[in-house]
Every structure is written in C-alpha cells, then in structure tokens.
Amino acid sequence: MEYTLEKGSWENISDAVQVEEETLPNSCYLRDNSAYFLNDTVGDLTMVRAGDEPVGIGKLSVLPDGSGWLETLRVRPAWQGRGVGKAIYARWLEEAQSLECPAIRMFTGTGNVRSRGLAERFGLSLAGTYIGATANLLTQEYCVPQGFEPVRDFRFARVLLESGRWEMEDFVVMNNTFFRCGEDTWRYLWEQGMVFADEQYNFAVIGARMLRQRGLHVAMYGGDGVRCLKFAKAYTQQQGLPAVTVSYPPQNSRIRAELEREGFVHDASCRIVMERILERKG
C-alpha cells in the first residue's frame, strides 16, 4: 500500500485530531496541544494518508539538547499492522538527520510490545525505565512550606541539578517527555523558571513542558524529600491546577516511600525510554 505523507498545519489539524481521537479516545491531547506543536516547537507533525483518508500521525520535536523526541504516534485501528507506523518512523529518521539531531528517543509502556518492536526495527534500544506517581489536589488545601524561591543564578541551579542526576539515572521526565540530563537541559529548566530552592538547599524542579492546564510535573527534587513534595503540591494548587506528577526510576525505594507518605498514587505499570544515537553526516 502506498501512502502520502504531509506536514501537519492549521489547514489539516482537524484530520490529525480525528486520527488521535479514534485511536486513543481516552488519552487525547492533540486538540488541546495543537498551538504548542504547530507554533512553538521545531519539528514536523506528520500525517499519513491512504488516498484522501487520514490514517496516522506522528510528531518529531527537537528538545533543548538538540535531540529528536518522537511523540504522538497514532495509527487508526483499522490501519494498524499495515505499514503506517513504519512510514512515520522512516520520515522521523529522515527529518532528524536533516535537523542534525545527535539522537532520537521515544517512550512507550513496558507492555506495549508492538511499539517497542517498531522502535527497535529503526535502531532504538532501551535507555531507561521509569514509573509515575500522581497526587490529586482537589480534595484538600495545602500550605506552601516557607523559603522556597526561584533560583536566580544558573551556576547554583546547575550545581543542584547535577547533585540529583545520578538518582534520576540520567533522565528527567515531564509530560511523558524524557530529557537527557546535561547542560542544555539544565539551562532550559532554569530559563523556564522551574528550579526552586530554600536556604537549606532543598530543591524541586517543577513545571510542565506542555498542557500545563492538566497539572505540573516534578522533574527532580533533592534534600528533604517530604518538604520538597509538600512544596510541589502546594505550589501546583496555588496555580489553580488539579494534579502534580513525579516520574523516577522504580527501583528507588526512598523516592517511592516519600511519594506514598505524601499521598501520591503510583501508576499501574512503568514506561520505558528508547534511544538511538545518530551519526553525523560529513
């Protein structure tokens, strides 16, 4: 079957939304996130058509370190297993190389054998396993611990972030986006105003890459963990937002215990991040 690939735009975004809402009716976000994808990111939203019919979509987004993040892969149920996903991956790889991305990455659930197999077919391999835990903030009011302020000095922010790097096993996660730890990611988090600390050097990195209205994400925290999580819950609630999520390596028993103490509910299963390092042309 031959497919036509076209770039997503405001002219055809309704077709892309239709694909997602048929594919994942309970996990849609493209309708709410179209402006961010089309206006605020480098990288194309690709749509696949069979004749005039939209059958699949996928987004490549360039992250702060220049890597290509492969997201929003959706193939309508009747078209799965018919090469639509392969066509999107081939386009992603071509685009990432043209953008000189040093790597490409994606995430999927640990039980999604088809998704992992497709990624492996295009040279991606396992880079990490993470689990999420979420606190619903609609049931009670939280008080903000005193002393947490945005970190104004990037050098200080970098020291804090590097101190938590090993515990996060070299990725920080927001909105199911896995950012490789390093200078470019640290600067992005700091420039976005996401790094907070108190005078005792307890710190939390909290914000959202996108879809802020659905809640915030703690990418990393350090020091007095319970104090940091109390700050994260109260700060999120102050913004009028309904939930805050933390993602971390599941074998970290200390983080798990702190989250459970503070009322976070863990996801039923883990997610994996897969990665391929790309060779530079020339």
Where on the chain are the PLM-derived regions?
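Active-site rim helix/loop that mediates acceptor-substrate recognition in acyltransferases
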Residues: 20-59, 165-197
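A conserved beta-turn-beta hairpin within the catalytic core of GNAT-like acetyltransferases
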Residues: 62-70, 80, 205-219, 266-270
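Conserved acetyl-CoA-binding loop-helix of GNAT-fold acetyltransferases
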Residues: 75, 81-95, 117, 224-236
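Conserved active-site alpha-helix within GNAT-family acetyltransferase domains
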Residues: 86, 110-128, 251-267
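Conserved GNAT acetyl-CoA-binding A-motif
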Residues: 95-111, 239-249
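Amide-forming acyltransferase catalytic core, primarily the GNAT-like/NAT-type
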Residues: 122-212
